[in-house]
Amino acid sequence: MINIAVCDDDLEITKSINKLLMKYQDERDLDFTVDLFNDGSGLKSSILKGKKYDLIYLDIEMRQMNGIATAKYIRSIDTTVLLIYVSNYDNYLKELFEVEPFRFMSKPINDKRFYMFLDLAIDRIRSANGIYCFRFNKDILTVILRDVIYFETVSYTHLRAHETELHL
């Protein structure tokens, strides 16, 4: 389960990001929870109640609590959450470095760029959480490393009518 927050005062952008996330989740058979916020104070309140996010999409200029103040608050509690800024304002780039964003995306959102950044974020989240993914037959299996006692590789090949047998 990957917990994602989207925080933007533009409802159309929030809906658009949510739609892209749902499409990505369905296409890749992943499990997301997505919380939507229209300002930084709502996101801050959710975090104060104990919600932990892996990835946050954040606008810079919002009414009650802007994206930079929100990110500073988030970083004071969680240094590992990935922040992707989605904004029309690139004149804040120097200030953004203080909160160590993962990526910056300009509006309007480019789907290809969005998915590229999301791929990178998912890879980073998986490696940080100790998740190991591997292909078995035609399926992609996922294992949480902290749940693994040990790995053992045993491969049997039986030639019976030109069939190969694999035991996992």
Task: Show where each model-derived region lies.
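Conserved acidic segment of CheY-like receiver
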Residues: I2-M22, I56
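Short, well-ordered amphipathic alpha-helices
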Residues: K15-Y24, L43-K44, A71
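Short hydrophobic/Thr-rich beta-strand motif most characteristic of the beta2 strand and flanking loop
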Residues: Q25-D39, S46
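Alpha-helix N-cap recognition
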Residues: D39-G42, T164
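CheY-like receiver
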Residues: S45-S127
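Conserved binding/recognition cores within well-folded domains
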Residues: Y115-R160
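Single conserved hydrophobic/aromatic residue that forms the stacking wall/gate
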Residues: H158-L168
